[in-house]
Design a protein with these regions (language model features):
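Extracellular carbohydrate recognition
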Residues: 182-192
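Short beta-strand-to-coil "C-cap" segments at the C-terminal boundary of structured domains/repeats
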Residues: 194-200
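Structured loops at beta-to-helix junctions and adjacent beta-edge loops in soluble globular domains
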Residues: 175-177, 196
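Extracellular distal adhesion/interaction modules in secreted or cell-surface proteins
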Residues: 4-170, 177-179, 189
Length: 200
């Protein structure tokens, strides 16, 4: 978390890795080391189509979670970038999570009257990434000043494309529309969540 005024900037180091592990390294599965509470926000939903006049349509997107040893997925949020709760980046769900039980994240979008293929942190290749404060963004997330960087990410990155979040936060990036890294649409920002852990 950064506290700012006109003349100073303090960046608090991440301590969340004292409480969770991310597996595999660079992957998207979060494993609590102890029982924790997590508050989850949708920072943004970036699946879009473009109309013939150049205007953008935001597409319904569903974010899901699997936790505490469950074999089934639970919906975190189902909606669009333009929804008020997403725009305000408010808490969408709060869960109590159990030590040593993996937390996985996934998502899909609804287009042409059908749901897309479900992508998750258990998928291969990896299409979901979990990062903490100070980590370098996934390599296909556009640079901080690039026009293709989603506006909703601006407050969570610094100018060197490192993650800038609170010391007990984990940010989740999802690529839902492409699997080939050279595709122009592969930008790792189709669904972005902020998971804030606490002990009570």
């Amino acid at each position: 978390m950064c506290i700012r005024d006109r003349t100073w900037n303090i960046n608090y180091p991440s301590v969340v890795k004292n409480y969770i592990n991310i597996t595999p390294p660079g992957g998207g599965t979060v494993v609590p080391i102890q029982n924790l509470i997590c508050d989850i926000r949708v920072l943004g939903l970036g699946v879009t189509t473009q109309n013939s006049n150049g205007s953008i349509n935001y597409i319904e997107t569903k974010a899901q979670i699997k936790y505490n040893g469950s074999a089934s997925w639970t919906t975190l949020y189902d909606g669009k970038e333009t929804d008020t709760l997403v725009q305000q980046q408010g808490i969408v769900k709060t869960y109590t999570v159990t030590a040593n039980k993996p937390i996985d994240f996934g998502g899909q979008y609804y287009y042409n009257n059908a749901w897309s293929t479900f992508r998750s942190s258990t998928s291969s290749p990896t299409l979901v990434w979990a990062l903490v404060n100070g980590d370098t963004c996934p390599n296909r997330v556009p640079d901080y000043n690039a026009p293709s960087l989603e506006t909703f990410l601006k407050n969570y990155l610094d100018s060197s494309n490192k993650v800038r979040i609170g010391p007990m936060d984990v940010i989740i990036f999802m690529e839902l529309t492409h699997t080939v890294t050279t595709d122009v649409g592969y930008d790792q920002q189709d669904c972005v969540l902020l998971v804030s852990f606490r002990t009570s």
